[in-house]
């Protein structure tokens, strides 16, 4: 009987070994969290307004006068492009070209970014104008007798105007981070995502609604709160009242 029991045990061990070889009974391992649920380290540009265009160009925007000055002083190169509006409180927008030709699609997205994150958002309009210049045309040297406020610049030379640029942005989660910017650059590849337009809700109330909508799609609430809390969502919203666009 002892020999028979050992023989059966050997047969059972052999069967398990064969199953492992065939991939039928792989040893259990701790499942790695999907990349979607991994919070990544913040990038240097995330202290500004920013997004990557659908063509892969990094676009920066100042949050206030101090960050406008920092972008100009540290990150604007002559080979870059800059966008601005004529309205007070305008976003200083920089397209980091890396010496490459910038497609029209990126310019259009940068224009939407520039007007949507400016004070024009709260003006009750559906669209606004902005203009494009080369990095070398932007200066902090005023004309004789003039004075420049902090965050303001002098633009010299020709400007290319973008007329009737529509307002509208999207917020979404992609690669473990909350992102925001033009719909065409943000919504594809982001899950969840929402579109924002000028409306009746203040930033805090809208951020709470966005958070609730995101929480319906993201099962890991701790992860969601770590990258897209209400306060973090507020940082991606334009100035002035807004609402979630019906889609």
Regions found by a protein language model. Give the residues of each.
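Extended, highly charged segments
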Residues: 1-247
């Amino acid at each position: 009987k002892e020999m028979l029991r050992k023989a059966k045990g050997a047969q059972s061990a052999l069967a398990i070994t064969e199953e492992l070889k065939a991939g039928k009974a792989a040893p259990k391992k701790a499942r790695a969290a999907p990349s979607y649920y991994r919070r990544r380290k913040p990038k240097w540009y995330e202290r500004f307004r920013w997004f990557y265009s659908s063509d892969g160009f990094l676009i920066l925007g100042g949050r206030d006068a101090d960050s406008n000055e920092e972008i100009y002083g540290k990150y604007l190169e002559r080979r870059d492009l800059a966008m601005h509006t004529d309205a007070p409180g305008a976003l200083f927008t920089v397209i980091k070209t890396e010496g490459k030709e910038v497609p029209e699609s990126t310019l259009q997205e940068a224009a939407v970014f520039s007007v949507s994150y400016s004070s024009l958002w709260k003006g009750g309009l559906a669209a606004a104008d902005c203009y494009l210049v080369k990095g070398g045309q932007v200066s902090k040297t005023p004309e004789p007798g003039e004075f420049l406020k902090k965050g303001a610049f002098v633009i010299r030379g020709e400007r290319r105007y973008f007329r009737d640029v529509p307002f509208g942005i999207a917020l979404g989660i992609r690669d473990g981070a909350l992102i925001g910017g033009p719909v065409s650059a943000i919504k594809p590849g982001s899950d969840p995502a929402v579109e924002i337009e000028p409306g009746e809700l203040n930033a805090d109330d809208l951020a709470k609604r966005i958070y609730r909508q995101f929480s319906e799609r993201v099962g890991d609430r701790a992860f969601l709160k770590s990258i897209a809390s209400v306060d973090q969502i507020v940082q991606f919203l334009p100035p002035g009242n807004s609402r979630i666009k019906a889609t």
